[in-house]
From Swiss-Prot:
Lineage: Bacteria, Bacillati, Bacillota, Bacilli, Lactobacillales
Induction note: By stress conditions e.g. heat shock.
Protein name: Chaperone protein DnaK
One Pfam family named in its UniProt record: HSP70
HAMAP family listed in its UniProt record: DnaK
Compositionally biased tracts (Acidic residues): 598-607
Source species: Streptococcus pneumoniae (strain CGSP14)
Amino acid sequence: MSKIIGIDLGTTNSAVAVLEGTESKIIANPEGNRTTPSVVSFKNGEIIVGDAAKRQAVTNPDTVISIKSKMGTSEKVSANGKEYTPQEISAMILQYLKGYAEDYLGEKVTKAVITVPAYFNDAQRQATKDAGKIAGLEVERIVNEPTAAALAYGLDKTDKEEKILVFDLGGGTFDVSILELGDGVFDVLSTAGDNKLGGDDFDQKIIDHLVAEFKKENGIDLSTDKMAMQRLKDAAEKAKKDLSGVTSTQISLPFITAGEAGPLHLEMTLTRAKFDDLTRDLVERTKVPVRQALSDAGLSLSEIDEVILVGGSTRIPAVVEAVKAETGKEPNKSVNPDEVVAMGAAIQGGVITGDVKDVVLLDVTPLSLGIETMGGVFTKLIDRNTTIPTSKSQVFSTAADNQPAVDIHVLQGERPMAADNKTLGRFQLTDIPAAPRGIPQIEVTFDIDKNGIVSVKAKDLGTQKEQTIVIQSNSGLTDEEIDRMMKDAEANAEADKKRKEEVDLRNEVDQAIFATEKTIKETEGKGFDAERDAAQAALDDLKKAQENNNLDDMKAKLEALNEKAQGLAVKLYEQAAAAQQAQEGAEGAQATGNAGDDVVDGEFTEK
C-alpha cells in the first residue's frame, strides 16, 4: 500500500510528515525548513506558496494569509484579478506540501490524513476534505489536532495508563482535549475550545498598540495604509517570538510612512510586561475551555497525569504560566509543539495502512447535533463529546393536521434555541399521507462518520419513504465545482512544473556558457585547435538560441555544446595526464642517478 502522508494544515504554518518504519518523520520543505508558512501569493500568473510567498507579503498585495480562519464560510478572497474560495487557497498549500513530500519519498502521493482543530464544525471539516480533493489527495481521515498530538506523544507509551490534557493554541484556533491512554487505546474523553482565538490575536494586540502609539506621536493613522499594516504584522509577529526568550525587544520600522515634513520612522521598545498586559484578556480566555473539558470528562485536576502543550503560541511565557496556574502542573515539554500534530497524523496514516498495529483511536464530536422543533427549540439527538463514528435516531411527528411535508432543519451547537446555533443544512420529507397532527411517525437519524462529517436521514415509518442528505452548508462546494477546481489545480501544477523546468534549463545554459568559455581560454595555444573551434562554434550557437529565447532550440544547442566541450575537456585532461607522467618519469630518473652518486666503496678486513 502506498504511503499515507500526515498533514497539519495550520493557520500560520503547516507541516507534513510520513511514517518511516515505526517512526514518524517531518519532511523539510525545499528551503530546508520543517514547517511551511500557510501563505499563498500570486505574481505574473505564478502561484507562490510558503516561505517565498511570506517574504513578498509586504510588497505584493496579491498575498493571502490565515485562510484557515475562513474555512467553512462562503467568504471568498480576491487576488490575481480573481475570486478564490478558502478551499482553493488551502488546496494550493496542500498541493505544495504534497509536492515536496513526493520529492522526498521519490514516489507519487495520493492519500493523506489531514488534521483540523477539535472544535471545527461540520462545514469546516467538509471544507478541509474538499481542499484535499482539489489538491489531488484522497483524504483517508480527518483527525482532531489535539488527538493527533496525543498519538505522537503516546505511541511509545502504550503499556502505560494515563490521562492527559492537550492544550493546543495555534495561529488561529484554540482547543483543549482530555484523553485516556492505555493498552494502545487513545480514548478522547472530552474536547472544548474557541475557534476565534490564536496567535494572530496576540499579534493584533501588538499591532493595535503600535498604531495607537504612532498616532499619538505623529497624528497619522497607519491602519489605513495597507503596506504599513503588513510591515506592522511582520514586526508584531517577530516581537511576540522575541519576547518568548527575552524581556524586552526593539521594534524598528524605518520609512513606515511620510508626513508633511518628510519620511517618518517607527521606533519603539516593547517589554514582556507590556505585552502581557496587552494580551491579558486573551490568556484569560484560554481558561474557560480547560475547565469545560475537565467538567465534561468528569475529572478533577488531580486525576490528570500530564499536560501537553501544542501549537507555536504555547511558547508565550504568560500562556505557559496560565496553564501551570490552571492545572497545577508543569507542562510536559517532550514534544515539539510545531511538529507534533503532523507527526501524529502520519501515525494515523500508519494505523490505516497497517504499519502501526495495536493502536485504536476513539475520537469525539465537539458539538451537539440536533434539529429545530416546534417553537424554534433546538432538540439534541447527539450530545457533544460522543465517541465517533456514531448513529442516533429519534421519532418526531407533524405539528399541524394533514401536514403534507416536514422541513428538517439540522443544527450544531449548545444553545437551547435553534436560532442561536449553527445551521448545517435543511431538507424536506414530502408526500406524508393526510392525518391529524401527532399521528405520522417521522424517524430522524443522525450519522457521524470517523471524520466527524454528518449525514441525516428522515423516514416516514408509515409509508417507509425516506430522504437522506450528507450535510452541505451554504459554503459547501458541489461535485462539479470541486472537479473544476481539481482541473485548475492540476493545470497550475503542470504550469508550475514547466516553469521550473524552464528556470532549470536557463540555469544550465548559463553554467555551460561560463564553463565552456573558461575551458576555451585555458586551452589557448595548447595545440588542439580543431576541438577548440568546434566548441566555440557550439557555444556561439547556444548564445544565439539564448538571445532568441527559443527553449527547444536552447535544449538542443546545450546538448551539442556539452558534447563538444566534453571533447575539449578530454583533450585537456589527456595533455595534463601526459605532462604529469613525464614529470614523474623525470623525477624517478633523477632520484636513481642521485642514489648512484652516494655509493662509497669500502674495504672489508677479517679479524
